[in-house]
Amino acid sequence: SFCLEPKRVGRCKGYFPRFYFDSKTGKCTPFIYGGCGGNGNNFETLHQCRAICRA
């Protein structure tokens, strides 16, 4: 599942507030996404992260 993938901020220099599921804590956590080169563990809202990863 992509919920278990590590957080990836990406290689671009954008500033997009997002959430990822932290498998160590079992919680959805905010981070800043650069805009490209990320992975599936990247959600626009806390609700979306919690719904998909069951946090």
Swiss-Prot record:
- What UniProt keywords apply to this chain's record, in alphabetical order? Aspartic protease inhibitor, Disulfide bond, Nematocyst, Protease inhibitor, Secreted, Serine protease inhibitor
Family annotation (SMART domains): KU
BPTI/Kunitz inhibitor domain ranges (all copies): 3-53
| Localisation | Secreted; Nematocyst
The terms under GO molecular function for this entry are: aspartic-type endopeptidase inhibitor activity; serine-type endopeptidase inhibitor activity
Q: Which PROSITE patterns match?
A: BPTI_KUNITZ_1, BPTI_KUNITZ_2
Gene3D superfamilies given for it? Pancreatic trypsin inhibitor Kunitz domain (4.10.410.10)
| InterPro entries per the UniProt record, alphabetical | Kunitz_BPTI, Kunitz_BPTI_sf, Prtase_inh_Kunz-CS, TFPI/VKTCI-like
Q: Write down the SUPFAM superfamilies for this protein, in alphabetical order.
A: BPTI-like (SSF57362)
Highest taxon of the lineage = Eukaryota
| Residue numbers marked as site, Reactive bond for trypsin | K13, G14
Q: List the disulfide bonds.
A: C3-C53, C12-C36, C28-C49
Gene Ontology terms, cellular component aspect? extracellular space; nematocyst
| Function per UniProt | Inhibitor of serine, cysteine, and aspartic proteinases.
UniProt xrefs under PANTHER family: BPTI_KUNITZ INHIBITOR DOMAIN-CONTAINING PROTEIN, KUNITZ-TYPE PROTEASE INHIBITOR-RELATED
Protein family per UniProt: Belongs to the venom Kunitz-type family. Sea anemone type 2 potassium channel toxin subfamily.
What does the further note read?
Does not show effect on crabs.
Q: What is this protein called?
A: PI-stichotoxin-She2b
State the organism's lineage. Eukaryota, Metazoa, Cnidaria, Anthozoa, Hexacorallia
